[in-house]
């Protein structure tokens, strides 16, 4: 993936996010977060990496590698999935899209080399080609006004379901439009060649989209309760513990790690789960802070943020909690703070936007 826009010339603050250098803040993080919540924000996806999977055996091979079902995936549609160890632990997460003649696998840059090397080891006698889409670039767009903004930019929107894609045009630029699945606001991605993406960016900004940096996107991620691999999902975690049941097919048949996933389902033996915490007293806890209830350690914090609100900020955190301590509304201690357990995504009322 190459740089998608000329943000270096705009005086934005840049830095590392999800394994790649990108724009962190364009002007004001608070305003950018509010654009994602109540308007429309456009952002770089320099931390996104795409791989192309082709060859006669691609369906059978890929279906045996990941936790979701691509054997029955219709052309133009995608799924979210995990890559697991034989012990059922999570090596990484990804999205896979069926383009008919090949699959597109999308991962964060921080995971790309590891997952590419890990999966390639299992191509033995299979007729499968698995390679990076090195000349691709992408941008994202999100918010309640996203579809109106796309149309104002001259991009016709086919009726896409979540994780569905279609080819579109914007002036002379050709692109693939991909509908995302963010829980708080509609979101799309535009994939194209590196040479055409800047024209797409300019068209969306002229149509009213607010340039948004990675810091505001991270706030929106936490507000939506979306776990990130390496932050909220680690190799020691099990798929069902993450709460991302959309990543798992229980009917597809064998894949690496399937035996453990099925055993947990059959026995109902899940001892902890991913949840939200709304801080009611004390400072924002740091990731890694222990969660306690009645003097016992019952979980851990993995992410935390101060969400912008009209009257200040709302402190929240994400993390894992043992089931016996995890009833909604229960009060727990997060380091030096007290918090209420809250289901995800967080409920953000009018005062939060």
Could you tell me what each predicted segment is?
Residues 13-15, 79-84, 161-172, 331-334:
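Short acidic-hydrophobic surface loop/beta-edge motif
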Residues 189-278:
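Anionic-ligand-binding alpha/beta catalytic cores of soluble enzymes and soluble regulatory domains
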Residues 29-38, 81-93, 123-126, 168-178, ...:
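Short amphipathic beta-strand starts and helix->beta connectors
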Residues 52-57, 141-145, 278-286:
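Short, surface-exposed ligand-recognition loops at beta-strand->loop->(often short) alpha-helix junctions
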Residues 1-80, 84, 89-91:
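Acidic, proline/glycine-enriched N-terminal capping motif
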Residues 41, 50, 72-73, 92-227:
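Acidic, low-complexity central loop/insert segments
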Residues 18, 86-87, 99, 170-173, ...:
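Short strand-coil-strand connectors
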Residues 94, 238, 242-258, 262-353:
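Glycine-rich, small/acidic residue-mixed loop/short-helix segments
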């Amino acid at each position: 993936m190459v740089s998608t826009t000329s943000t270096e010339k705009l005086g934005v603050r840049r830095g590392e996010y999800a394994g790649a250098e990108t724009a962190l803040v364009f002007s004001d993080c608070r305003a950018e977060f509010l654009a994602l919540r109540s308007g429309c924000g456009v952002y770089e996806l320099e931390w996104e990496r795409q791989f192309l999977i082709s060859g006669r055996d691609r369906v059978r091979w890929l279906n045996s590698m990941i936790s979701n079902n691509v054997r029955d995936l219709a052309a133009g549609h995608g799924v979210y999935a995990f890559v697991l160890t034989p012990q059922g632990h999570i090596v990484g997460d990804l999205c896979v899209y069926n383009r008919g003649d090949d699959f597109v696998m999308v991962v964060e840059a921080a995971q790309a080399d590891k997952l590419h090397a890990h999966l390639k080891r299992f191509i033995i006698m299979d007729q499968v080609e698995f390679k990076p889409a090195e000349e691709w670039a992408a941008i994202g767009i999100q918010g309640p006004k996203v579809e109106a903004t796309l149309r104002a930019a001259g991009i016709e929107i086919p009726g896409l379901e979540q994780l569905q894609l279609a080819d579109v045009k914007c002036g002379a630029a050709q692109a693939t439009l991909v509908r995302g699945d963010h829980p708080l606001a509609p979101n799309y991605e535009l994939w194209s060649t590196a040479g055409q993406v800047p024209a797409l960016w300019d068209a969306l900004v002229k149509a009213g989209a607010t340039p948004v940096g990675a810091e505001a996107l991270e706030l929106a991620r936490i507000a939506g309760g979306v776990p990130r691999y390496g932050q909220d999902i680690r190799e020691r975690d099990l798929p069902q513990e993450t709460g991302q049941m959309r990543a798992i097919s229980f009917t597809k048949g064998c894949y690496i790690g399937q035996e453990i996933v099925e055993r947990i389902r059959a026995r109902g033996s899940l001892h902890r789960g991913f949840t939200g915490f709304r801080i009611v007293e004390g400072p924002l806890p740091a990731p890694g802070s222990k969660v306690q209830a009645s003097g016992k350690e019952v979980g851990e914090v993995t992410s935390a943020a101060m969400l912008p609100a009209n009257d200040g900020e709302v402190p929240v955190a994400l993390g894992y909690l043992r089931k016996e301590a995890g009833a909604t509304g229960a009060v727990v201690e997060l380091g030096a703070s007290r918090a209420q357990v809250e289901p995800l995504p967080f409920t953000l009322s009018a005062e939060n936007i």
